[in-house]
C-alpha cells in the first residue's frame, strides 16, 4: 500500500436550517438538509513511522495544535492505538467562517485518509462517532451522503434530492457560529418539517436574519444575488447561494456580479467527491 495519499475535502450547503428549540445543555435542536458541492480543499498525506503528526500548512489565526486536522489525526491515533504518524499539507480553498464546512470537512477527510493509510479498518459508524467529538458537522462529511439532519445535526437520514448547480458568494467576513446561536433575537421555536416540505420551497434559514443584522457584508451579498435568483444563507454564514438548473445559467449570473466579490460555481452532489475518490482506492 502507498504511504502517500491526496484526497479532497468538499464544501457543503445547508439548503435550509430550522431551529426547533434550545436544550438544557445549551445546544440547539435543529433540522437541516446537507448537500455536498464538487468544490473544496485538497489534503495531501504521507505516513511516517515515528508517531509524529505534522501539518505543514499554516492557517492564519489557528495554532497548529488547535487545527481540526491535527486534532482529528491525534484523536484517531489515541482511539486506535496506532503508533504511526503523518505529514499533512493543505491546499486551502474554502473560507473559514463561511458556513460551507471547511474545517469540519478537512477533519473528516483526515479521519478517512488515515483510516486508509494506517490500515485501521474502522467502519463508517466508528469513524462518525469519533468525528462527532470534533464537531457536529463532521459526521455528515465522514459518511459522505446528502442527508436530512436532526438533533444537534448528528442524526442523519440519507436523502436523494435534485443535484442542481449553485452560485456561492463569499463575503469577506468571519462569522462566529457561537455568536449567532447565542443571539437573543434568534428564532428558536420553528416547527419540525419533512424533507418534502423543503423541496416544495417552504423553508428558510433561521440564522439568516441575525447574520444579516450583524454582518452588513452578508446582507449586501443577499440583496445583490436576490436580484437574479432566490438567495439564501448557508449554515451560520457568511456564504450565500442561489440554485440553477445548469452550469451555463449559474455562470451567466456570476459574470454579471462585481469583480471584487469572491464567488464560485459548483455542482451539488448527493455523494461527496471525497467518497467517490475513496471508492477508486484499492
Swiss-Prot record:
Query: Which Gene Ontology biological process is one annotated for this entry?
Result: isopentenyl diphosphate biosynthetic process, methylerythritol 4-phosphate pathway
Pathway(s) annotated for this protein in UniProt: Isoprenoid biosynthesis; isopentenyl diphosphate biosynthesis via DXP pathway; isopentenyl diphosphate from 1-deoxy-D-xylulose 5-phosphate: step 3/6
**Catalyzes what?**
4-CDP-2-C-methyl-D-erythritol + ATP = 4-CDP-2-C-methyl-D-erythritol 2-phosphate + ADP + H(+)
Q: Which InterPro entries does this entry report, sorted A to Z?
A: GHMP_kinase_C_dom (IPR013750), GHMP_kinase_C_sf (IPR036554), GHMP_kinase_N_dom (IPR006204), IspE (IPR004424), Ribosomal_Su5_D2-typ_SF (IPR020568), Ribsml_uS5_D2-typ_fold_subgr (IPR014721)
Q: Which UniProt keywords apply?
A: ATP-binding, Isoprene biosynthesis, Kinase, Nucleotide-binding, Transferase
EC numbers, comma separated:
2.7.1.148
User: Molecular function terms in GO for this entry?
Assistant: 4-(cytidine 5'-diphospho)-2-C-methyl-D-erythritol kinase activity; ATP binding
Q: Which residues form the active site?
A: 12, 137
The keyword ATP-binding belongs to this UniProt entry's keyword annotation? yes
This protein's gene is called: ispE
Described by its record, this protein's role is as follows:
Catalyzes the phosphorylation of the position 2 hydroxy group of 4-diphosphocytidyl-2C-methyl-D-erythritol.
Source organism of the structure:
Pseudomonas aeruginosa (strain UCBPP-PA14)
Domain of life the protein comes from: Bacteria
Give the Pfam families listed for this entry.
Answer: GHMP_kinases_C, GHMP_kinases_N
Could you say which protein family the record assigns here? Belongs to the GHMP kinase family. IspE subfamily.
Determine if Membrane is one of this entry's keywords: no
Segments traversing the membrane: none
Protein name in UniProt: 4-diphosphocytidyl-2-C-methyl-D-erythritol kinase
Binding positions (ATP): 95-105
